[in-house]
């Protein structure tokens, strides 16, 4: 952007959008100037005769095709560089004579001893002819830059090309020529090119902002009328900005569909695109249909078509292959696909090679390897065991991967074993349970212990080293005393790869001979407990996941290398590959494709150039849900069309479909993935109030990976609009009071406007009331409308009120403790480092479905970690809308003392109610409830105190063994004795005459 006397940098006070259109038009064509390249011009100069005696030489200067060159008397030729003619220091005047110092392609060249008049005339001649030669080129460059920058929004790619063109031209003339250098040459193009060459990033941003301002003013009426409500300032800006790649971060309720419609309409209204040049993409048929309906209603039958990715892929395939592809029935019938995969699997199991592969997999690679020493607590290690459901080839649940490998090896070698049987001699006492060795080999009378120690004798961080070694010593002594045979195995042997050698050596020393089971026998055992059928189902899932990724060359190897357990993944894929071949052969034989082919083949055809993209503008809805394969297709389509712009609308806070292959990194790292990018955040939600927004936004932003974007609300409130009901979920006998859910629904019916909508949302479908219960509630509360949805199904919907159910901890809790199979995990996008990242976003989605108010229901005995976080973080939630018992106030603080991560939950046995760790049987810790009221008891110093405020019963704990102390009568009166006391045998004999209870312990921390 340049005026007649243009500065070298943009002046921020100038309206650059005006100047760029005014002054570019002033660039003139230089048709009147001679074409210097078509003429041969030369000028000879000789030094003063006197100076020739001192070595001064004559030369001829020529204007040739390559530019100005000088030819010396000796026929040496040099090309004169532009800086020589732009630099006033080239002509140097002395007392008697002058000289020219010219920069050439071989270095400086000096011509001295020249008459001043001759030297000056030559310099001006060189400069004039140089400018005459350059002027048309510079004018052409200026015109090309003008044409480039008047195509529309100043995209980074266009600006970089323009700046490169200008810098290349500037290198030819170095500086803007002065008017007296050549009267026939105008300096405007030179100035314009010099300014463009010197543009900085802030100059470019001002240029873009000026363009946006002009467009917003020009199309203000369009943006006011294109939707039922005028677009907001940010929505309009998002429609106008047309960078090479555009990301619109549209928070919940901010009107992303309005932006999609407004963007498409603006491109047509402004003449930047025809309808046939615009591609609009959605993920689901329903979403595409709704988008199409909205476009037709707001823009008329303009010719824009909203398509799904699969429909797009199918059209690309049809254009390349000349016919519409046929869809395999298996693509729409998961049960039929699973049956077909099972049939192929069973056929392969008949071959010896495949039998060996499957047995090796089950023996060594069925579970992901994990070192117990890498976990911080026993509870975390138990989480790993529970999540992977570690079982032997015989189907037994075991407590460690090492034990599983030992059992599998013994089984495969034909050695009968029993897992954790009671020792043949009685060892139980009031202090200790009966000893149960890890394994017993009944045919040989041999016990096996697998010790969790490293080579230095260290234990895992959460295991008391001294007590563990005492236990090891006690076991050795016991076997020695009773004369029973024991072999000992160690964790470090597994880590060092010598575990099976150790088993072989010790059993051989005891004269145990192996009788390896034939593969058929091993497979038969695996069938007995459903392992073969389960693996067949897994193969069907792996087949779908593998094909959905549409791998290109090298990507499979990368997926294996990046997996947390590469050997396990590699072993599984070797079993999957024959199934993949069978499936592809079936498709080829039938001449059919599946949904994954619609993406994969389209990617291939666009990449290879077999499909020519007609689209200059690609608009993608719900971009946070995009997979790597779909992102690849979008990138190839963008690169296949000249000046194609990518426009993506999504919200990283609502990315909840990783399990289908969605990769959030394409949103959070959009610029790194796609290149030059403009990010616009829609900052105003029309759905929920500030109370919901404050809680939901703060909650989701605990994950630092989420983009921190502003989100304002139209409805400002001064009181909490997220409420928590804390109530015991245990069924009570003879209790006919309302359920927790009905209490909330009754409350909503009392405060809501008639006709208000209420969503009941659950992490899983079984969290929700069944159809009969929902009908009963609907009849009882006719003033409100009730609907049930899983949180995933509620995405994109909204209601006046939302009730979130299933906020519990555990495998099917919220956040879910259920883990993705490690093999499927390896084929999914990389797992985020932040704990429960996607589950956190899922709760954000649940919260932001509500317009007026959200209700959370939880039992604090098994409360979700998210509920505990809301309480501990002192979020602005209403805790007083419903009455809450003191036990519910305290329960979330009562964790299992042994494993530290488990929660003590009520259980019933033949002896009555007790509280046990929810990680049982891995963690067997249990405690009695209060003898008076059956409520849970909390630990405070050496006391157990009932959490029931109407009871507050207390019991002292034995400092020797940890059992409860009870009052007894003796010869000298009452005393306190340990509950583990017995008159004979091993027991605890600790007694105390007096125990004083500290009443200050009743002052509860949570009060």
Residues covered by each model-derived region:
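Conserved RecA-like helicase ATPase core segment
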Residues: 471, 476-477, 631-720
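P-loop NTPase Walker
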Residues: 16, 57, 106-112, 138-327, ...
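Helicase P-loop NTPase motor core
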Residues: 257-260, 375, 387, 676-678, ...
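Phosphoinositide-dependent membrane-docking surfaces
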Residues: 68-70, 76-95
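Conserved helicase NTPase motor core
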Residues: 177-181, 187, 194-252, 257-261, ...
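C-terminal accessory regions
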Residues: 808-888, 909, 913
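Conserved P-loop NTPase-based nucleic-acid remodeling module centered on helicase motor cores
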Residues: 277, 282-285, 289-362, 477-537, ...
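A short beta-strand element within the Helicase C-terminal
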Residues: 789-818
């Amino acid at each position: 952007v340049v005026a007649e006397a243009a500065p070298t940098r943009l002046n921020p006070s100038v309206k650059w959008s005006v100047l760029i259109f005014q002054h570019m038009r002033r660039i003139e064509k230089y048709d009147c100037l001679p074409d210097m390249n078509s003429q041969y011009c030369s000028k000879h100069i000789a030094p003063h005769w006197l100076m020739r005696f001192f070595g001064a030489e004559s030369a001829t200067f020529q204007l040739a095709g390559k530019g100005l060159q000088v030819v010396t008397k000796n026929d040496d030729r040099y090309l004169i560089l532009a800086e020589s003619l732009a630099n006033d220091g080239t002509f140097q005047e002395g007392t008697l004579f002058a000289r020219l110092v010219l920069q050439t392609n071989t270095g400086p060249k000096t011509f001295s001893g020249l008459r001043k008049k001759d030297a000056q005339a030559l310099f001006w001649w060189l400069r004039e002819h140089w400018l005459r030669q350059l002027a048309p080129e510079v004018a052409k460059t200026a015109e090309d830059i003008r044409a480039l920058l008047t195509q529309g929004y100043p995209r980074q790619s266009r600006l970089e090309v323009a700046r490169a063109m200008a810098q290349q031209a500037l290198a030819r003339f170095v500086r803007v020529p002065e008017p007296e250098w050549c009267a026939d040459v105008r300096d405007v193009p030179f100035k314009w090119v010099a300014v463009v060459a010197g543009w900085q990033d802030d100059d470019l941003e001002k240029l873009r902002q000026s363009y946006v301002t002009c467009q917003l003013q020009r199309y203000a009426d369009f943006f006011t009328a294109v939707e039922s409500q005028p677009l907001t300032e940010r929505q309009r800006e998002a429609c106008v900005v047309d960078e090479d790649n555009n990301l619109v971060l549209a928070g919940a309720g901010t009107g992303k569909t309005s932006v999609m419609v407004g963007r498409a309409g603006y491109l047509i209204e402004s003449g930047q695109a025809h309808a046939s040049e615009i591609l609009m993409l959605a993920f689901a048929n329903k979403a595409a249909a709704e988008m199409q309906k909205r476009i037709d209603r707001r823009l008329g039958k303009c010719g824009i078509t909203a398509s799904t990715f699969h429909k797009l892929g199918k059209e690309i395939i049809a254009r390349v292959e000349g016919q519409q592809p046929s869809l395999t029935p298996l693509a729409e019938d998961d049960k039929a696909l699973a049956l077909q995969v099972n049939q192929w699997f069973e056929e392969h199991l008949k071959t010896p090679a495949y039998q060996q592969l499957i047995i090796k997999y089950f023996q060594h690679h069925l579970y992901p390897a994990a070192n117990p020493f890498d976990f911080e607590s026993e509870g975390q290690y138990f989480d790993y065991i529970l999540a992977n459901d570690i079982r032997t080839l015989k189907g037994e649940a075991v407590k460690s991967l090492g034990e599983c490998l030992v059992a599998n090896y013994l089984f495969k070698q034909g050695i009968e074993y029993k897992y954790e049987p009671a020792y043949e001699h009685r060892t139980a006492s009031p202090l200790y349970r009966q000893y149960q060795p890890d394994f017993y080999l009944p045919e040989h009378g041999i016990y096996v212990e697998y010790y969790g120690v490293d080579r230095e004798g260290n234990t895992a961080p959460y295991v008391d080293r001294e007590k563990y070694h005492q236990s090891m010593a006690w076991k050795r002594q016991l076997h020695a005393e009773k004369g029973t045979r024991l072999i000992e195995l160690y964790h470090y042997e597994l880590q060092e790869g010598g575990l099976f050698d150790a088993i072989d050596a010790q059993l051989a020393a005891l004269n145990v001979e192996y009788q390896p089971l034939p593969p058929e026998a091993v497979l038969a055992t695996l069938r007995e407990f459903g392992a073969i059928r389960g693996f067949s189902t897994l193969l069907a899932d792996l087949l779908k996941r593998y094909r959905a990724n549409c791998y290109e060359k090298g990507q499979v190897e990368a997926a294996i290398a990046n997996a947390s357990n590469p050997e396990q993944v590699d072993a599984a894929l070797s079993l999957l590959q024959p199934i993949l071949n069978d499936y592809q052969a079936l498709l080829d034989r039938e001449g059919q494709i599946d949904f994954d082919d619609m993406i994969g083949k389209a990617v291939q055809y666009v990449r290879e150039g077999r499909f020519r993209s007609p689209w200059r503008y690609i608009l993608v809805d719900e971009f946070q849900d995009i997979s790597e394969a779909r992102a690849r297709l979008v990138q190839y389509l963008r690169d296949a069309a000249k000046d194609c712009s990518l426009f993506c609308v999504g919200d990283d806070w609502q990315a909840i479909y990783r399990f289908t292959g969605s990769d959030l990194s394409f949103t959070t790292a959009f610029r790194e993935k796609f290149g030059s990018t403009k990010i616009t955040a829609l900052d105003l939600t029309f759905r929920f109030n500030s109370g919901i927004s404050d809680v939901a936004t703060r909650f989701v932003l605990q994950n630092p990976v989420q983009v921190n974007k502003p989100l304002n609300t139209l409805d400002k409130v001064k009181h909490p609009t997220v409420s928590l009901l804390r109530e015991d979920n245990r069924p009570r006998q003879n209790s006919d009071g309302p359920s927790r859910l009905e209490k909330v629904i009754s409350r909503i019916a009392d405060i809501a406007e008639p006709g208000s909508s209420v969503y009941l949302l659950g992490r899983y479908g079984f969290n929700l009331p069944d159809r009969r219960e929902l009908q009963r509630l609907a009849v009882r509360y006719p003033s409100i409308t009730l609907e049930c949805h899983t949180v995933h199904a509620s995405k994109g919907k909204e209601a006046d009120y939302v009730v979130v159910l299933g906020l519990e901890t555990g495998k099917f809790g919220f956040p879910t403790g259920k883990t993705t199979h490690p093999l499927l995990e390896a084929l999914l996008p990389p797992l985020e480092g932040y704990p429960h990242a996607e589950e956190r976003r899922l709760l954000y989605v649940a919260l932001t479905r509500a317009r007026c108010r959200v209700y959370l229901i939880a039992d604090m005995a098994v409360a979700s970690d998210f509920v505990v976080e809301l309480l501990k973080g002192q979020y602005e939630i209403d805790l007083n809308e419903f009455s809450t018992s003191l036990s519910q106030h305290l329960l979330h603080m009562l964790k299992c003392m042994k494993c530290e991560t488990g929660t003590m939950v009520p259980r019933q046995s033949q002896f009555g109610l007790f509280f046990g760790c929810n990680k049982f049987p891995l963690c067997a810790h249990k405690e009695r409830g209060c003898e008076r009221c059956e409520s849970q008891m909390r630990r405070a110093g050496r006391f157990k105190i009932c959490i029931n405020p109407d009871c507050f019963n207390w019991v002292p704990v034995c400092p020797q063994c940890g059992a409860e102390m009870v009052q007894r009568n003796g010869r000298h009166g009452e005393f306190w004795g340990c509950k583990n006391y017995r008159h004979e045998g091993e027991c605890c004999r600790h007694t105390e005459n007096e125990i004083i209870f500290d009443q200050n312990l009743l002052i509860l921390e949570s009060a």
